């Protein structure tokens, strides 16, 4: 029987990256669990205080909750399995599991950009149109907008997964520590022009479009604050630089993950495949609950109060 692509049925893949880091797998496992645990704790605290405190039932805090929950979803699709695989010595993943992980990672990535954009727009309205803000950005509007964006993202990510399903796999070795769409496309026998075009156009459209909106909103916000007072100006610039740092690390990682296969002429170092996703989707994204939650005064105070209650010590 001929072993042509049409006759090859792939049910499992090998995550080569896990084999490459075998010598220090316990260190990586501890790091993965630490990042996931911190993210889970911070996300839980932010969501809990926002849900229970009526004073926080406002668009800005709703958006912060949506962002940290999305970060939690992204980390949950990556770090727990990574830690389990490293501790157990397992380096394989099923086709179904691979597609599910790819779907969750892509959904997290696209929804994160839109959340950044919505938050920038919300702050622009709050500073630039304070008298109309509560009419323009109600809780219902925020929730409806976020839900519509989420559904849109589910659709575009599902289309990407379906485009992969129509292909035939010729290999099983994924040069990474987890599954994502570009890794799978590198293993197919068919022409992937449609897949590459779809992802490239979508990535450029979303990234550039959202980046322009974010830049416009924050620049306008800073300009308005400069006209108010020196204190407001200082706070706005400090907040803006924090947001730019978090967003820049995130967007650079997304672009790298999407273009590394299409732009490279040879195999990419497995160590690079490990370091970039770990920093980009791990440490950088896990910082979001701190950046957007703990640096927000109202949230920070409520979280501290709840922590004092947990340890049974009255706040001084």
Question: Where in the sequence are the language-model features?
Answer:
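Transmembrane helical core of 7TM receptor-like proteins
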Residues: 1-316
């Amino acid at each position: 029987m001929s072993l042509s692509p049409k006759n090859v049925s792939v049910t499992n893949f090998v995550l080569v990256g896990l084999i490459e880091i075998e010598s220090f797998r316990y260190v990586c496992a501890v790091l993965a669990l630490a990042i996931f645990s911190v993210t889970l704790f911070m996300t839980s605290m932010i969501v809990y205080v926002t849900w229970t405190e009526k004073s926080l039932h406002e668009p800005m805090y709703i958006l912060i909750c949506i962002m940290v929950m999305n970060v939690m979803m992204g980390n949950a699709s990556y770090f727990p399995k990574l830690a389990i695989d490293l501790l157990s010595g397992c380096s394989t993943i099923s086709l179904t599991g691979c597609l599910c992980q790819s779907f969750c990672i892509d959904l997290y990535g696209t929804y994160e950009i839109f959340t950044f954009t919505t938050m920038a727009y919300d702050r622009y309205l709050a500073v630039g149109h304070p008298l109309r803000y509560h009419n323009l950005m109600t809780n219902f509007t925020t929730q409806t907008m976020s839900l519509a964006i989420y559904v849109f993202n589910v659709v575009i990510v599902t289309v990407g997964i379906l485009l992969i399903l129509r292909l035939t796999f010729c290999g099983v070795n994924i040069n990474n520590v987890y599954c994502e769409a570009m890794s799978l496309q590198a293993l197919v026998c068919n022409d992937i022009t449609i897949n590459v075009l779809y992802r490239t156009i979508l990535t450029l459209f979303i990234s550039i479009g959202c980046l322009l909106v974010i830049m416009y909103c924050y620049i306008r916000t800073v300009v308005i604050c400069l006209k108010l007072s020196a204190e407001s100006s200082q706070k706005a610039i400090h907040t803006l630089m924090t947001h730019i740092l978090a967003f820049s690390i995130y967007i650079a990682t997304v672009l790298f993950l999407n273009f590394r296969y299409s732009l490279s002429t040879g195999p990419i170092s497995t160590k690079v495949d490990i370091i970039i996703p770990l920093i980009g989707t791990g440490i950088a994204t896990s910082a979001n609950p701190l950046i957007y939650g703990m640096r927000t005064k109202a949230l920070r105070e409520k979280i501290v109060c709840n922590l004092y209650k947990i340890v049974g010590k009255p706040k001084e």
